[in-house]
């Protein structure tokens, strides 16, 4: 099924790209973004719609946990709506920040009410009972994961390669713990096919349809498998990207000074002269090494 999903996406993406170009479903570049990105204006977007829908299909066939599929569907709707509004309005805004946050929070709450997870967490081998506070923690994990992947999706190929570099080791880690979440690999196969057309110069972008969904799935899987803290190490780059935004905003509001030339962090490296290809390569290797270190520490690989 993993290979089938890869081949299906590889076959369908050229068709989707032609269709989106014909329908002028293109990316609008935000004005506050780097000037270097001006040439990307009009590149087909919402490309995540394909690997998400095929992932959902093969996920159902592989009997993926219903809650994971539900989470995928809910976050897909948010990402799709955001991209759809951007295309219709012909600007980069889409949903407003508070609207997106509200929808993500509501989706996560629905998930938690249905999952009713145990209220303890595994803090790298130490079990901590959080009681009712766990629900707030889990809410932050799911919404935070969704936003972190969304923030990472700012360069050609970056979010896709980060997902692949983290999800495959994460799957092995869960397998070692007796949990099978094949949806991670199924989605990864679709993302790999997408990367054939998303690597610089990108012929299509995943849009929020893809990035918000990928992050939502990761957050949901971590809550279901009680691996919330481990998820951070398998996807360290999205965490760092998110922290760079928080630090940048906080520093400017409090001290009226910026820490980075621009946030998220990948834009900072762009503005100091790194090429997109170099940033994507360095970030991907960093994320992969972090993931492999986790596997080594916890005895998954000898």
UniProtKB/Swiss-Prot annotation:
The keyword Aminoacyl-tRNA synthetase does not apply. The chain crosses the membrane at residues 1-21, 42-62, 68-88, 123-143, 154-174, 178-198, 204-224, 229-249, 279-299. This is Phospho-N-acetylmuramoyl-pentapeptide-transferase. Belongs to the glycosyltransferase 4 family. MraY subfamily. Keywords: Cell cycle, Cell division, Cell inner membrane, Cell membrane, Cell shape, Cell wall biogenesis/degradation, Magnesium, Membrane, Metal-binding, Peptidoglycan synthesis, Transferase, Transmembrane, Transmembrane helix. GO terms for cellular component: plasma membrane. It is an enzyme of class 2 (transferase).
């Amino acid at each position: 099924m993993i290979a089938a999903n890869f081949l299906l996406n590889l076959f369908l993406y050229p068709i989707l790209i032609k269709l989106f170009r014909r329908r002028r479903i293109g990316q609008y570049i935000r004005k506050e973004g780097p000037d270097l990105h001006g040439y990307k204006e009009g590149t087909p977007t919402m490309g995540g719609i394909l690997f998400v829908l095929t992932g959902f299909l093969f996920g159902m066939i592989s009997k993926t946990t219903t809650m994971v599929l539900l989470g995928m569907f809910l976050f897909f709707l948010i990402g799709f709506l955001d991209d759809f509004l951007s295309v219709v309005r012909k600007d980069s805004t889409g949903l407003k920040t508070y609207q997106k946050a509200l929808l993500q929070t509501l989706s996560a709450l629905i998930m938690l009410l249905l999952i009713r997870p145990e209220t303890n967490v595994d803090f790298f081998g130490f079990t901590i009972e959080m009681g009712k506070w766990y629900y707030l923690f889990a809410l932050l994990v799911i919404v935070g994961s969704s936003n972190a992947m969304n923030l990472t999706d700012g360069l050609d190929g970056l979010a896709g390669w980060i997902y692949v570099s983290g999800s495959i080791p994460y799957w092995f880690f869960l397998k070692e713990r007796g949990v099978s979440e094949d949806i991670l690999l199924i989605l990864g196969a679709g993302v790999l096919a997408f990367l054939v057309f998303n690597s610089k110069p990108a012929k299509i972008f995943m849009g929020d349809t893809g990035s918000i969904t990928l992050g939502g799935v990761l957050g949901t899987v971590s809550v279901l498998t009680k691996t919330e803290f481990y998820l951070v190490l398998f996807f360290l780059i999205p965490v760092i990207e998110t922290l760079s935004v928080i630090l940048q905003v906080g520093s400017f509001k409090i001290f009226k000074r910026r820490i980075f030339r621009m946030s998220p962090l990948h834009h900072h490296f762009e503005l100091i002269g790194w090429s997109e290809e170099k940033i994507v390569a360095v970030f991907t290797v960093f994320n992969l090494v972090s993931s492999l270190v986790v596997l080594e520490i916890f005895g998954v690989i000898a």
